[in-house]
Design a protein with these regions (language model features):
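Active-site-adjacent "subsite" loops/lids of carbohydrate-active enzymes
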Residues: 5-19, 29-30, 35-94
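Substrate-binding cleft/loops of secretory-pathway carbohydrate-active enzymes
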Residues: 39, 143-185, 190
Length: 214
């Protein structure tokens, strides 16, 4: 399921990283971009050569193309959800990771089609819930977190329902927004972009069991 260079190596890179990290008392999480298929010609060709799901690129129920060589898995598809969950379980069952971490790409501009914002959030939320439950059913000590976009409005528009993830059980253990801007933002360097974004996230309703990291 995983495209890698393992077959050409005499060792498993992820396994070795976990061993090295744990020896030094460092926790290690597997960072996953759940929906992304390809970003350019090279990654597209790799997917077509190595993936068992290459036929999905010809099926709009399973994938969405939004530019030349750029595809994501269709978040609306149950087959896609099952495939992503199987990949997560493969990691959790075979490696001593301390957590699973999702990147900020869910829907992408150009992939919305006829969906509403609410439908996009519902489709993504089904995956998030199922991933959380799958992880906890295998090992309740493994955490599940997401790094949504630093721009809250973009998150919601692209299907990342951060409000629900923060305030309801069964979605995530933490979120870590990708706030990459400084407090010297803009042409005049006077916009407090980092502080403004962090304060926005900190102001969202959140249950105590869900952590917010910056």
């Amino acid at each position: 399921k995983v495209i890698c260079h393992r077959s050409s190596l005499s060792f498993d890179p992820l396994e070795e990283m976990i061993k090295l990290a744990h020896k030094k008392g460092i926790s290690i999480e597997a960072w996953i971009n759940p929906y992304r298929i390809s970003l350019n010609k090279n990654t597209y060709q790799n997917f077509m050569e190595l993936s068992s799901k290459k036929s999905w690129l010809e099926d709009t129920k399973q994938s969405i193309g939004y530019a030349t060589y750029k595809y994501i898995f269709n978040p609306e598809s149950q087959d896609v959800r099952d495939y992503i969950i199987a990949g997560v379980k493969e990691i959790v069952e075979n490696y001593e990771v301390d957590g699973i971490h999702f990147d900020d790409y869910f829907y992408i501009e150009g992939t919305h089609g006829e969906t509403t914002q609410g439908q996009r959030m519902d489709n993504v939320n089904m995956l998030i819930q199922d991933v959380y439950q799958s992880i906890k059913s295998i090992n309740s000590n493994i955490v599940f977190g997401i790094s949504p976009q630093g721009n809250y409005e973009n998150c919601v528009n692209e299907g990342a329902d951060v409000d629900t993830w923060l305030k309801e059980d069964g979605y995530v253990d933490y979120i870590m927004p990708q706030v990459y801007w400084s407090d010297q933002y803009g042409p005049d360097g006077k916009t407090r972009m980092f502080t403004d974004r962090i304060e926005l996230y900190a102001g969202l309703k959140r249950q105590k069991t869900v952590m917010l990291y910056a």
